[in-house]
Amino acid sequence: MFYSKPIKIILYIGVIFCTSLSEYDMVLEEDSQMNRMVESMELFKMIGKNRWLSEKQLILFMNKTDILKKKISCSPLTSCFPEYDGPNTYEGAVQFIQKSFVELHNEEDKNVFVHLTCAVDKECMQLVFDLISDIIITFNQKECSML
């Protein structure tokens, strides 16, 4: 008797990637030569270039905004990004880091949705989840030719 398991096809509409804004001046525990932010950027680039995920939308959560706000005045962004010549402020740091991540996927057909988050802030996270839901609904409507 022949039994076969059903093949399940999973369709991914996007990839949610989380990075910590506060780790720009830290190194990995397992590799003291590797900056955590640089490693996060390399992983983000690899995921976006993966042949199975290359056409999928990328949703980037840049988390720990609260910690970055406190930390940036004491530890300059140039510790990770020597090329950074902007102001040593929260706004300047976020703008530069966000641009650096988005530029990793600058093809015209690749959208990177960036959301600044503070996971301990319930209102912020609810807003983020609502936005992600809207993205998913819009994608599904496009796939069904409703838009």
Where are the model-predicted features located?
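Switch II (G3) loop of P-loop NTPases
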Residues: M1-I9, E23-V27
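Conserved acidic residues
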Residues: I13
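Conserved GTP-binding G-domain of TRAFAC-class P-loop NTPases and closely related GTPase folds
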Residues: C18-L147
